[in-house]
C-alpha cells in the first residue's frame, strides 16, 4: 500500500513538472490538487498545505471565486486542525466574503461555523459564541435542523470549557431535542458524548456512564475514532467507580478500533490509561509492557509527552524492583 502511494506521489510530481515546463495552467492546477489529496490520504496534512497554497496563487490570477472558495476552505481546515488558528480565520474570512457576494447563505453559515471552531481553539470564548450565534441565525433562517443542532452542540462545548455547566447542559439539551426530531443519530451520538464528558469532569459518574452507553448504542462502525473516544471515556469512568475489569474491557475495545484505523496518537493515550490500571493493581510487568508500547509510539511520532511517559515507566519499574528485593 505504501509502495503504491509512493509511486502515485512520484507520478503526480512528474505531472507537475511537465505542466510547469509547458506552462499548462489547467494541468498544473489539477496536479497540485491531486498532490494535496494524496498527502491528506497518506495522513500527512501538513505537506498538503504547500501544493494548495500554490494552487490558490494560480486561482488568484484569474480571481474566479467559484474555484477559489473550495481551496480557501480546504486550506483553512488544514491550518485549523493543526492549531494554525490565525491562518485559518484569515482564509475562512476571505471565503465567507466571496460566499456573501454570491448570496450563498448556506455556505456562509457553514464557514462562519468553522470560524467559531477556530475562535474556540484560541480560547476566545466571546468571539466563538458571537460567531456561532451568527451561524445559528443563518441556519435557522434556512431551516437547517441538523446544522442548528450542531451549532447548539458547539455552543455547549464553549460553555463547558468556561465551566458554565448549567448553560452547557441547556445548550446540549436543545441540540439533542432537535437531533431526535430530525432522527440525526450521528449528531445525537456526538452530543451525548459531550454530555458524558461534562458529567465526567463534574465527577457525576453514574450520569456519565448512562450518557456514554447511550452514545455508543447510536454509533455505527463507520466512525471508529468517535466510538473509540467514547469507549476511552467510559473506561475512565469505570476506573473511577472501581470497576477495573470493566475499564480494561472498554480500553481494549477502543485500542482495537484505533489500531485498525492506524491512529497511533490516540492508541498511545489508551495504552497509557491501561498501564495505569495495571499499576494500580500491582501488575507491574503488564504495566511496563504497555508503557514500552507508549514510549515506542512517542519516539516514532515525536510526541511531546515522551519525557513524562518515560518517568511513568521508571516509576513502575522501581516498584517492580522493590517487590523483587522484598522477596529476596
Which residues fall in each region the model found?
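Alpha-helical linker/edge segments of TPR/alpha-solenoid repeat scaffolds
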Residues: 275, 280, 314-328
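Short coil/turn linkers that connect adjacent helices within long alpha-helical scaffolds
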Residues: 21-24, 60-64, 98-104, 138-144, ...
Amino acid at each position: 500500500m505504501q509502495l503504491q502511494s509512493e509511486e502515485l506521489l512520484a507520478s503526480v510530481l512528474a505531472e507537475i513538472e511537465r505542466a510547469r515546463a509547458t506552462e499548462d495552467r489547467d494541468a498544473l492546477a489539477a496536479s497540485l490538487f491531486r498532490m494535496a489529496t494524496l498527502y491528506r490520504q497518506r495522513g500527512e496534512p501538513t505537506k498538503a498545505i504547500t501544493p494548495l497554497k500554490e494552487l490558490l496563487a494560480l486561482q488568484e490570477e484569474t480571481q474566479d471565486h467559484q474555484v477559489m472558495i473550495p481551496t480557501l476552505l480546504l486550506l483553512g481546515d488544514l491550518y485549523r486542525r493543526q492549531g494554525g488558528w490565525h491562518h485559518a480565520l484569515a482564509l475562512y474570512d476571505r471565503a465567507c466574503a466571496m460566499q456573501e457576494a454570491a448570496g450563498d447563505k448556506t455556505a456562509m453559515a457553514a464557514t462562519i461555523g468553522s470560524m467559531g471552531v477556530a475562535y474556540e481553539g484560541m480560547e476566545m470564548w466571546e468571539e466563538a459564541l458571537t460567531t456561532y450565534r451568527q451561524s445559528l441565525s443563518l441556519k435557522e433562517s434556512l431551516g437547517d435542523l441538523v446544522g442548528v443542532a450542531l451549532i447548539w452542540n458547539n455552543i455547549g462545548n464553549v460553555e463547558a470549557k468556561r465551566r458554565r455547566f448549567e448553560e452547557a447542559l441547556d445548550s446540549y439539551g436543545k441540540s439533542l431535542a432537535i437531533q431526535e426530531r430530525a432522527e440525526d443519530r450521528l449528531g445525537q451520538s456526538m452530543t451525548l458524548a459531550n454530555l458524558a464528558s461534562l458529567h465526567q469532569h463534574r465527577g457525576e459518574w453514574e450520569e456519565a456512564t448512562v450518557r456514554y452507553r447511550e452514545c455508543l448504542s447510536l454509533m455505527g462502525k463507520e466512525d471508529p475514532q468517535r466510538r473509540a473516544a467514547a469507549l476511552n471515556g467510559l473506561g475512565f469512568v469505570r476506573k473511577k467507580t472501581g470497576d477495573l475489569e470493566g475499564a480494561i474491557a472498554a480500553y481494549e475495545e477502543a485500542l482495537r478500533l484505533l489500531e485498525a484505523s492506524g491512529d497511533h496518537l490516540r492508541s498511545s493515550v489508551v495504552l497509557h490509561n491501561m498501564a495505569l490500571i495495571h499499576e494500580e493493581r500491582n501488575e507491574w510487568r503488564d504495566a511496563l509492557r504497555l508503557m514500552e508500547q507508549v514510549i515506542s509510539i512517542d519516539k516514532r511520532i515525536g510526541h511531546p509527552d515522551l519525557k513524562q511517559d518515560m518517568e511513568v515507566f521508571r516509576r513502575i519499574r522501581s516498584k517492580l524492583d522493590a517487590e523483587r528485593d522484598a522477596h529476596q
